[in-house]
Amino acid sequence: MLDAKRKWLLICLGLFISIFFLTVTNSPPAQKPPIKVGLLLPYTGTMPLQAKGVTDGVELYFDEIGRKAGGRPIQLFKEDTELNPTVGLTKVRRLVEDHNVNFIIGPVHSGVALAIHDYIRKQKVIQVNPTAFTRELTSPQKASENIFRVCETTDQSNFPMGMWIVKNTPHRNIVITGSDFAAGHHSVEAFKAGFEEAGGKVVKDVFPKMGTMDFAPFLTTIDVKGADAVYAWFAGTDAVRFDQQYEEFGLKKRLPLFGHNVITDDPYLASIGDAALGIITAGHYSYTLDTPENRAFVKAYQGKYGETPSRYSEFGYTAANVVGAVAEASKGEVEDIPRVAKEIKRVATKIETPAGPLAFDKYNQRITNIYVLKAEKMDGKLANVVIGKIEKVAQEDVWKWWNK
């Protein structure tokens, strides 16, 4: 009798164990924690359209991959730098210390990027800088294994543009002008170096403060004897006011206006209006670029947002692509920063962005095509139309004038 009971208990125990293991085996696996991505952008201030473009590009790419990479969901956190370096440092601390983000995409402003640089390089986080393009950030003196940049530097577009103007136009005596902060100075000074190396001469430089409302006093000083053109760097609403007042002042007819693409930025072209017509600029992207990758990007972007993408949209899209690609290649294991940093360089070479092939140099700076653009009417709408191309410009090719 006892043996029968014992057998019955053993049978029941065996059935229980079998049912338990079947249940465990057939249960869905526990979901992995999300990959956290922080957007550190100026949603308020004078550059909200830049922030919108980056954000829209990021969201489009992550939507295309189902908000998931490497088997982990992707979670976004947004912080407003207010275009203020002190605020930017506070907000990046919040992303890292409160939200524990794995990646940071941002900022836009070079001053903010420099303010957060030393903090970022000490953290277990990867920063993909979409827009801040002062040359310092990826210089040998400041480069860091966990900081990447997908926009061009101040040298990469402006230095070769100086050479392009000498080669392709009759202008040899130019006034340079830009906003009185790091990116403004570095941009027009890089242009000066390339222009003078090619045989041109800069006859004057003028640096209004960022946020200048009335450019008349500066336009008076720009109009100097012997000058035959002007090269400018102004961003956001500063560019709108400068371009409009430049034309109102009657300068454009006798002093053609050139510059970096910020002075005819796509998000601000409609506000600038016909004052933008004929301005020739250098930049890494235009939605008018005729490649299969860009046509697909423009179609998807228009389908989602009902408008054409700006260069900020491409920056954001490419930054998100870097994050998604490395997360996928790493099978979601993105916490080992040195390994992830090495993996980014490997996967980047397989990415064909809307602006062209992607690659990073040894300082984690993007090597990029630079396009010469002219503001024209296209289908009744102002657009930066591609009229020239400078291929695969690396920062090491164009920084010799200061990095000696």
PLM regions with names:
Residues 2-404:
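Extracytosolic ligand-binding ectodomains
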